[in-house]
Regions:
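Ser/Thr-rich, Pro/Gly/Ala-heavy low-complexity intrinsically disordered linkers and tails
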Residues: 21-68
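Bacterial N-terminal signal peptides that target proteins for export
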Residues: 1-10
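Serine-esterase "nucleophile elbow" of acetyl-processing enzymes
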Residues: 64-116
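Oxyanion-hole/transition-state-stabilizing segment in secreted/luminal serine hydrolases
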Residues: 135-189, 215-220
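Bacterial N-terminal signal peptides
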Residues: 9-18
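Structural recognition of the beta-strand scaffold that forms the well-ordered cores
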Residues: 78-82, 88-89, 110-116, 159-165, ...
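Catalytic His-Asp segment of secreted/periplasmic serine-dependent ester chemistry enzymes
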Residues: 218-311
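A short beta-strand-loop structural module common to alpha/beta enzyme folds
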Residues: 103-140
Length: 311
């Protein structure tokens, strides 16, 4: 074997060593990045992110590993908050003033308005999964249904739409094994069918971002343990399965803020033990977190920020 051949073989050996080192370094870097990632999910890669508030309220927050920042919607954004009485209490905790202050400090023009939906008449004072599905999916189109605007109408005027359920949503009956999207009966299986239709419908309007509250809880005096457990099961499903990263739908975890990880609205956060409306204490706590969550969604952090609105 001549000198030229020996030199060629030596060059090949050195190249192999260098490639091996490079591959090992890349793999190690990827492993380091994975191990240092502080984003959590509720799947097998999940870890808990528990936050304790000054008032002692504790929340368990999860976000998805596939989450990425999205583009900001800009500085001029119209926001519509659809609600009933529970939402009205939180609104009264200072939501409007929070946005006024934020706009003044940040030079933005985030314009938020609230609206009762659906109204007491002619539709009826019901804002549960069936009712949103009935108005927005079952009666979709450019014409109002019983004087209630469809998504085709709302999205033509609004950049962000926030919707929620009032606390009777947590009074859930047992499943019967036959989910019915057209049923007004409050069961987990019916809720899931209605939420599936709502997700598909909201995704038809990619220029509009939606913020969905996890449902309001009932006090212990107002609900059974079985029903309250079903409520927690459903709202956990909303967070961990129904809500997916990368689309135009986001969740604000009001249920977790209310229940502190339990099954009921605690009496110290309720209007009274047998009145499941939130009190002023909870409203003052929740209002800025709600407002911050909406801003996170507007500014592209909907999939990466905490779903309670905490920093």
């Amino acid at each position: 074997m001549n000198a030229r051949t020996w030199g060629f073989l030596a060059l090949l050996a050195m190249t192999a060593v260098l490639l091996g080192c490079s591959s090992g370094s890349s793999k190690k870097a990827a492993e380091d990045a994975t191990s240092s990632n502080d984003v959590t999910t509720s799947t097998d890669t999940a870890a808990q992110d528990v936050t304790t508030h000054p008032d002692g309220l504790t929340t368990d927050v999860t976000t998805n590993l596939d989450a990425q920042d999205q583009t900001s919607m800009g500085s001029d954004v119209k926001i519509l908050f659809l609600h009933h009485s529970t939402g009205g209490v939180i609104w009264g905790g200072g939501v409007e003033q929070w946005f006024t202050d934020y706009n003044s400090n940040q030079g933005t023009s985030y314009q938020i308005v609230e609206q009762a939906f659906p109204k007491d008449a002619p539709y009826g004072w019901n804002n549960y999964p069936f009712d949103y599905w009935n108005i927005w999916v079952n009666h979709a189109g450019p014409v109002a249904f019983t004087e209630e605007p469809t998504l085709e109408m709302l999205t033509a005027k609004q950049d962000v739409i926030v919707w929620k359920h009032c606390f009777p949503v947590s009074g859930i009956d047992a499943d019967n094994g036959a989910p019915d999207v057209t049923s007004e009966q409050k069961t987990v299986e019916n809720y899931k069918a209605q939420y599936a239709g709502l997700k598909t419908k909201m995704r038809e309007f990619p220029a509009t971002r939606f913020v969905v509250w996890t449902g309001a809880a009932l006090t212990q005096a107002s609900n059974s343990e079985e029903s309250a457990t079903r409520a927690r099961t459903f709202f956990q499903w909303v967070k961990s399965e129904w809500d997916e990263p990368g689309d135009n739908i986001f969740v604000w975890d009001f249920y977790e803020l209310e229940t502190q990880g339990g099954l009921y609205l605690p009496d110290n956060f309720a209007a009274s033990p047998d009145d499941s409306h939130p009190n002023d204490t909870l409203a003052q706590l929740a209002a800025p977190l709600f407002a911050q969550r909406v801003v996170d969604v507007i500014e592209g952090r909907g999939d990466t920020g905490k779903i309670t609105g905490e920093p």
